């Protein structure tokens, strides 16, 4: 049975400020001074390791940095829904988007890639036709508000690329190219894309990101290991990424965070919008 929001709220309060989550101090990420229309956007991406990271822990991190966009891979619908409920309870209501079904060929479908977007951005809708062809979950959403106040809003992509191995190298290359191609198409003019790419910045597939830039690399966080967490950060590999259109989005700050229950570190960035 689904837990009541009151019970979840109590658990959220009991867990305290330091349990389960450690974020490097970074004032440019954890800022409360965002305008109503959010031209400064905070993005968080986390592989929750088959929902090993609890909704309380995930929501605590998202709320602590004021996340406007949250990408969760290897996550159940139930986990994401509880994260959204906890964020709403903290004053950050979110709209939730599940993976496009055709992108779940390699998944049990219980665990997928789910995207949360602030309701203060107005209505977003899934665009299946431009969603990358992955097998562990992907979704692309586009803004429906076209008035001047929302003109800056980006197309948002969340995806999880299949892991590279001897038997599936071709599949990995195909799926990685599908994600990278988003930065070479018309949607790249104003794009935020994040997720578990299962590739480092030094893999050939990420060598040419077209109209995009790695938001973490802009602030020298791009080489910090995000997986596996049992290795120190300098020894891990940075396979979780946030890419943005370099003509519109500039990185004000970025960091990675240790999150209990998952073998991945979360990646976070605060972005500032500018006209071309």
Regions picked out by a protein language model, each given a short descriptive name:
Residues 20-30, 69-154, 158:
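Structured beta-strand-rich core segments of catalytic domains in phosphoester-bond hydrolases
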Residues 94-116, 200-260:
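Active site of divalent-metal-dependent phosphoester/diester hydrolases
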Residues 42-48, 58-84, 116, 156-159, ...:
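Active-site beta-strand/loop signature of hydrolases that rely on acidic residues for catalysis
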Residues 14-61:
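N-terminal signal-anchor transmembrane helix
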Residues 2-15:
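Single conserved hydrophobic/aromatic residue that forms the stacking wall/gate
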Residues 43-51, 164-171, 227-231:
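Acidic/histidine-rich helix-loop elements
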């Amino acid at each position: 049975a689904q837990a009541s929001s009151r019970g979840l709220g109590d658990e959220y309060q009991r867990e305290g400020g330091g349990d389960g989550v450690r974020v490097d101090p970074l004032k440019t990420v954890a800022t409360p001074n965002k305008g109503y229309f959010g031209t400064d956007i905070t993005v968080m991406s986390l592989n929750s390791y088959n929902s090993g990271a609890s909704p309380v822990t995930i929501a605590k991190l998202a709320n602590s940095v004021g996340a406007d966009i949250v990408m969760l891979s290897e996550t159940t619908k139930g986990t994401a829904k509880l994260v959204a409920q906890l964020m709403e309870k903290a004053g950050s209501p979110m709209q939730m988007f599940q993976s496009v079904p055709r992108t779940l060929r390699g998944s049990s479908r219980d665990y997928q890639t789910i995207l949360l977007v602030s309701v203060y951005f107005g209505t977003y809708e899934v665009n299946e036709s431009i969603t990358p062809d992955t097998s562990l979950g992907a979704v692309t959403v586009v803004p429906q508000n076209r008035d001047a106040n929302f003109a800056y809003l980006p197309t948002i992509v969340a995806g999880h690329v299949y892991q590279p191995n001897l038997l599936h190298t071709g599949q990995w290359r195909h799926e990685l190219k599908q994600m990278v191609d988003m930065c070479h198409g018309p949607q790249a003019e104003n794009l935020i894309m994040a997720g578990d790419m299962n590739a480092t910045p030094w893999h050939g597939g990420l060598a040419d990101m077209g109209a995009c830039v790695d938001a973490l690399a802009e602030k020298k966080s791009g080489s910090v290991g995000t997986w596996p967490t049992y290795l120190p950060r300098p020894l891990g590999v940075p396979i979780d990424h946030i890419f943005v259109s370099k003509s519109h989005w500039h990185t004000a700050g970025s960091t990675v965070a240790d999150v209990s229950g998952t073998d991945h570190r979360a990646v976070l960035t605060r972005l500032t919008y500018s006209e071309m």
